[in-house]
């Protein structure tokens, strides 16, 4: 605990909070252009081919972002909306592409957690048959 004299000489330092998604520049989302769409493998012990895209954002940053859901329509020069949120088993991937926004299509035939994947509500007649 510092004395009053010590506080007069040296004021208390403010704790600065470092952003986990600096490329968004304090915005909730950013628009960007895909420069490369490819698959990559996760860290041990997981095994898969995760779909990712390198995106040039309007903030000037070039980031690697994850494409969630089954199947996608992205290719080079696609315009995408990028949000924060890292992928734990992919090093360097700290952003997600928003499905159903701009050039990114929503996930087809998605019935649960639809809002996260840009999927419309299915028609009442096309609902799954009850058991």
Swiss-Prot record:
3-methylthioaspartic acid PTM sites in chain numbering: 89
Keyword Nucleus: no
CDD domains the UniProt entry points to: Ribosomal_S12 (cd03368)
Gene3D superfamilies, per the entry: Nucleic acid-binding proteins (2.40.50.140)
Alphabetic keyword roster: Methylation, Ribonucleoprotein, Ribosomal protein, RNA-binding, rRNA-binding, tRNA-binding
Quaternary organization: Part of the 30S ribosomal subunit. Contacts proteins S8 and S17. May interact with IF1 in the 30S initiation complex.
Pfam families referenced in this protein's UniProt entry, alphabetically: Ribosom_S12_S23
Domain of life: Bacteria
Protein name as annotated: Small ribosomal subunit protein uS12
InterPro entries hit by this protein: NA-bd_OB-fold, Ribosomal_uS12, Ribosomal_uS12_bac
PANTHER family: 30S RIBOSOMAL PROTEIN S12 FAMILY MEMBER (PTHR11652)
Listed GO biological process terms: translation
Function: With S4 and S5 plays an important role in translational accuracy. Interacts with and stabilizes bases of the 16S rRNA that are involved in tRNA selection in the A site and with the mRNA backbone. Located at the interface of the 30S and 50S subunits, it traverses the body of the 30S subunit contacting proteins on the other side and probably holding the rRNA structure together. The combined cluster of proteins S8, S12 and S17 appears to hold together the shoulder and platform of the 30S subunit.
Species of provenance: Campylobacter concisus (strain 13826)
Family affiliation: Belongs to the universal ribosomal protein uS12 family.
SUPFAM superfamilies, sorted: Nucleic acid-binding proteins
Source species taxonomy: Bacteria, Pseudomonadati, Campylobacterota, Epsilonproteobacteria, Campylobacterales
GO MF assignments: rRNA binding; structural constituent of ribosome; tRNA binding
């Amino acid at each position: 605990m510092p004395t009053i004299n010590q506080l007069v000489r040296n004021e208390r330092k403010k704790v600065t909070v470092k952003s986990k998604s600096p490329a968004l520049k304090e915005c909730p989302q950013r628009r960007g252009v895909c420069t490369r769409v490819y698959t990559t493998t996760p860290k041990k012990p997981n095994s898969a081919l995760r779909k990712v895209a390198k995106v040039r954002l309007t903030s000037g940053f070039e980031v690697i972002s994850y494409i969630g859901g089954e199947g996608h329509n992205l290719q080079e020069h696609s315009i995408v909306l990028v949000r924060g949120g890292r992928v734990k088993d992919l090093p360097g991937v700290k952003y997600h592409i928003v499905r159903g926004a701009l050039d990114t299509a929503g996930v087809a035939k998605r019935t649960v957690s639809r809002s996260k994947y840009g999927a419309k509500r299915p028609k009442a007649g096309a609902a799954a048959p009850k058991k």
